[in-house]
Amino acid sequence: MEHGSSRGFIWLILFLDFVSRVTGKTQVDALIALRSSLSSGDHTNNILQSWNATHVTPCSWFHVTCNTENSVTRLDLGSANLSGELVPQLAQLPNLQYLELFNNNITGEIPEELGDLMELVSLDLFANNISGPIPSSLGKLGKLRFLRLYNNSLSGEIPRSLTALPLDVLDISNNRLSGDIPVNGSFSQFTSMSFANNKLRPRPASPSPSPSGTSAAIVVGVAAGAALLFALAWWLRRKLQGHFLDVPAEEDPEVYLGQFKRFSLRELLVATEKFSKRNVLGKGRFGILYKGRLADDTLVAVKRLNEERTKGGELQFQTEVEMISMAVHRNLLRLRGFCMTPTERLLVYPYMANGSVASCLRERPEGNPALDWPKRKHIALGSARGLAYLHDHCDQKIIHLDVKAANILLDEEFEAVVGDFGLAKLMNYNDSHVTTAVRGTIGHIAPEYLSTGKSSEKTDVFGYGVMLLELITGQKAFDLARLANDDDIMLLDWVKEVLKEKKLESLVDAELEGKYVETEVEQLIQMALLCTQSSAMERPKMSEVVRMLEGDGLAERWEEWQKEEMPIHDFNYQAYPHAGTDWLIPYSNSLIENDYPSGPR
């Protein structure tokens, strides 16, 4: 009997292995079909060179992300200079959640078969040359939240089936669509901006009442109703004055873009218990962050800005806030709404229960597990994707100016979410000139920004490089405690000194307890050093960082950089134990400024 059970168990293992191999091979076939359709030109071949048809699973390929069951969940091929057509075989990726093929030269039509991707959350095909209709089959995608097809050549009518989707973001502008704009379902929340520059008929205005013999009665009824509402409003105002701060009147809340909302001050006073100290999540240079609970029981984080206001800045503030709200990406903290009164400026964000990377690294509650190495790698990639989107894919480029572990938040799945972006410009909305105040945090500020006050996307790249070192070491970017051991107070300088002594193991966070892949640590350090070069021009763009983190081009960039830099430095370069790689240590500078703790928010 025992022998039979063992045999049955072995057969079960063999069967599961067979199923796994068949599933993996199906995914390989689907992606190879995509490669065959898109592989034109030397650059494209380089982008997809790791896609090997002989592999059992595609999970080791560049630009492909898998879950723990080796199912493909994400394709990241945005801005990859691809040409060709989409293929119906993409439907053979049943667990695909994110299909990112924006800003290429893709032609042809959207395959109907994409409607079979039942796990799809985000479909980004914008900025291509795709033609034909929007497939009605997309209406079957019950989990689709982000649909961006703008800047293509799509034609025909908008399928009514799309109105049933739980969309948070919709943009099908700048196409050749015709017919009516649906007004029901999720489409009711989107403004005309989502449909602009098409051949669509405008949405019908609300019908006006036709003249009749009862018009006088209607007027009387309306007047009576208005009087009743006025009396009720007066009573409520008297009733609420004992429970709320008395503030000047503000505009009624309204929806601007998607679910972006203007909240009333009273809503947020109730949500935060009048900005109670016990709801404080953190303090920063832009203001205080509070935990809040809305009337529908949704948890939010409310940032109470502390900037000085001058007369006439309200419209510019609202414009900048709406611009920030349009930056929507899986790895960006989405702005849910705002509140603006003569005395308050408030921003409302989703609440992040897992806090920030900084809090997970250095303020972890007792009993909570440390961030393991796979999570840290995933955080590095996710935050890079978010920053790359801010730099390259927003209508107006957004430079963060304070990239650090405390501003990289973690959602319920420990996905990295870049927070506090756009605030540097927002807080200067009354000033059209270059600011003389250098914004940022000690240890993260790029030397050229510190010396000249001029910022660029490369300023963020520097901060990102330091954040990578925080992920690897678990330490703060600036820490006076290191003086006790005669070490550099700047994390970047300390890392350089340790690397000169070839003590890689002493760099890695002790909380990992040795559970990391040494070659992967080396690669992240290489990336951090490339990002923190003293010359802004020599640093990679964030889009390049994403590709290198996905395994595309890091070795070549590192080798090239070493050859260029080696004659400049006067200390001895010894090959660090890593496949003939020299560790090159460039110069950097920093500014002393306080940082703030950041727990769940």
UniProtKB/Swiss-Prot annotation:
The active site is at 402 (proton acceptor). Belongs to the protein kinase superfamily. Ser/Thr protein kinase family. Gene3D superfamilies: Phosphorylase Kinase, domain 1 (3.30.200.20), Ribonuclease Inhibitor (3.80.10.10), Transferase(Phosphotransferase) domain 1 (1.10.510.10). Residues 25-215 are extracellular. PROSITE patterns: PROTEIN_KINASE_ATP, PROTEIN_KINASE_DOM, PROTEIN_KINASE_ST. It is a single-pass type I membrane protein. Its EC number is 2.7.11.1. LRR repeats lie at residues 71-94, 95-118, 119-141, 143-165, 166-188. It holds the Pfam family LRR_1. The modification Phosphoserine is found at residues 356, 359, 451, 456, 506. The modification Phosphothreonine is found at residues 272, 298, 435-436, 441, 452, 532. Glycans are attached at residues 52, 81, 105, 129, 151, 184. It catalyses: L-seryl-[protein] + ATP = O-phospho-L-seryl-[protein] + ADP + H(+); L-threonyl-[protein] + ATP = O-phospho-L-threonyl-[protein] + ADP + H(+). Residues 1-24 form the signal peptide. It comes from Arabidopsis thaliana. This is Somatic embryogenesis receptor kinase 5. Autophosphorylated. It is found in: Cell membrane. Serine/threonine-kinase of unknown function. Interacts with TMK4/BARK1. Residues 275-572 form the Protein kinase domain. One of its GO terms (biological process) is protein phosphorylation.
